[in-house]
Structure formats: C-alpha cells, structure tokens
Amino acid sequence: MNQYHDLLERILGEGTEKHDRTGTGTLSVFGHQMRFDLASGFPMLTTKKLPFRSIVHELLWFLRGETNIKYLKDNGVSIWDEWADANGDLGPVYGSQWRSWPARDGRGIDQIANVIDLIQRNPDSRRLIVSAWNPADVDRMALPPCHCLFQFYVAGGKLSCQLYQRSADVFLGVPFNIASYALLTMMVAQVTGLKPGDFVHSLGDAHLYSNHLDQARLQLSRPTRPLPTMTINPEVKDIFAFRYEDFRLENYDPHPHIKAEVAV
C-alpha cells in the first residue's frame, strides 16, 4: 500500500492549510490518483488495523438501497451514527441514489442493476457509470456523497473500476473507501463472469484534518506488510444476494489500530 503512504507524505509535505465545514481545519492537496492491481492482493491497509466487518456491512447496506442505520446498528456498525437523525434516517444518501435514483417521470432508476446488465450486454460501453451526486437531493442528505461517481471498464476479460471522490478524509475515510470499492469491483466481476482488474482511486480535495497529523506520521513510521487476500463465495451470482458470510479476508496481519476523532 505504498500508494497510500505516498499520498500521506504528499499532503504532509505540500498540503495547503484550509478551513472546512467542521471547523477543524485541514492540510489539503487537489487532484491525486492511486491504482491498485487486485490480482496483487486485497488493498487493505496493513500499517493500521481496519474494521473488516464494518467495511463489508456498509457496502452491503449501500447495495440494499437503505438509508436508515438500523441494518448497520443490528450488525454492530456505528460509523454513520453521528449523522443520523433521531429515527436513524440519513435522507437520500448513497443507497437511495444507487438503487432508486428519482427520474422525472416518477420512476426509481436502479443504477446498480442497470450497470451490471450493461456490462453483460455491451462490455465496451463507455457508459458503465453509477453516480451518487444528485443536485436535486443534496440538500436533503445528512452528508452529501464524498465518493460520488464510479465507472467500470472491461478489457481482456478483466473488470476495472475508477472512483471519483470529491472530498477525501485521507486518514479515516480513504482506507475504508479503497477496501470498499475494491470489494465492490470483485463482486461485480464475479456476477458478470469477469476477473478483477484494477481499482483506480481519483481524489479531488484530499485532506488530513489538523487533529490527524500526528497519527499520519505514526502510520508512516510503520513498515508495510504483505497484503491479505479476499475470498468470495463463488456460488453467489446475484449482486444483491451477497451476505457478510460470503466474504473471507485471509492472511491479514496489520499493525495496531490508530485512534483518531471523526470530524462531523
């Protein structure tokens, strides 16, 4: 995961101090790209421990089209608690846009089902896109989508994915996002009969919060370890049929967790 460490070093070395919505303050760079070959191991950080269970359940929650945190709470995941209202609702966030984008004629467009169908019918299409950024709904979301658009690409029997992330909390959020979209790429590859290719992560405003700088330096002081491998139940051929038990992370040997506060 040297790609991620390079990003930390770039922000610490050349980042611009900026004010932000949370009032915490950041060091920020604009425009950065990382590429991960999914055949070379599952891109889960080894220089600090990440919560595999939370990453998987959040992705399954997105794919269920849900926007209430009940499913997450029922599965011991608390990463969205700070943004939910008293009823656990978040407004029309990721799951709603992915699975039921509101069309002008009143239909809900299932972008996930549509993109999988298009990959199978026309793998050379340049329209293999899913967007979570809906200007008509942004003001009703508890948190507008940070990872807001992704595109698939098929070549040589392999499926690659590029994510555009407008706002990237590099210490806390980005490691989650890398693992989540790498896993999504592997899942979509399996249900479309392809092999996983690359995950490409393109960042807009990539930042370290001012209260994460010491933690980033600590992480950079740790040597990287071999990447783990991800095994997915090969019997699952429907993207919406996956369960937590269908995923097995093997040979994950990270350094200890590094605590950092979330900026809300």
UniProtKB/Swiss-Prot annotation:
Subcellular locations according to the entry: Cytoplasm
Superkingdom of the source species: Bacteria
Recorded catalytic activity of this chain's protein: dUMP + (6R)-5,10-methylene-5,6,7,8-tetrahydrofolate = 7,8-dihydrofolate + dTMP
Classification via PROSITE patterns: THYMIDYLATE_SYNTHASE (PS00091)
One GO term of the biological process aspect: methylation
Key words of the record: Cytoplasm, Methyltransferase, Nucleotide biosynthesis, Transferase
SUPFAM superfamilies: Thymidylate synthase/dCMP hydroxymethylase
Pathways per UniProt: Pyrimidine metabolism; dTTP biosynthesis
Catalytic-site annotation from UniProt: C146 (nucleophile)
A GO molecular-function annotation: thymidylate synthase activity
CDD domains: TS_Pyrimidine_HMase (cd00351)
Amino-acid positions noted as binding dUMP in the UniProt annotation, renumbered to this chain: R21, R126, R127, R166, S167, A168, D169, N177, H207, L208, Y209
Residues that bind (6R)-5,10-methylene-5,6,7,8-tetrahydrofolate: D169, A263
Membership in a protein family: Belongs to the thymidylate synthase family. Bacterial-type ThyA subfamily.
Subunit organization: Homodimer.
Protein name as annotated: Thymidylate synthase
Gene source species: Nitrobacter winogradskyi (strain ATCC 25391 / DSM 10237 / CIP 104748 / NCIMB 11846 / Nb-255)
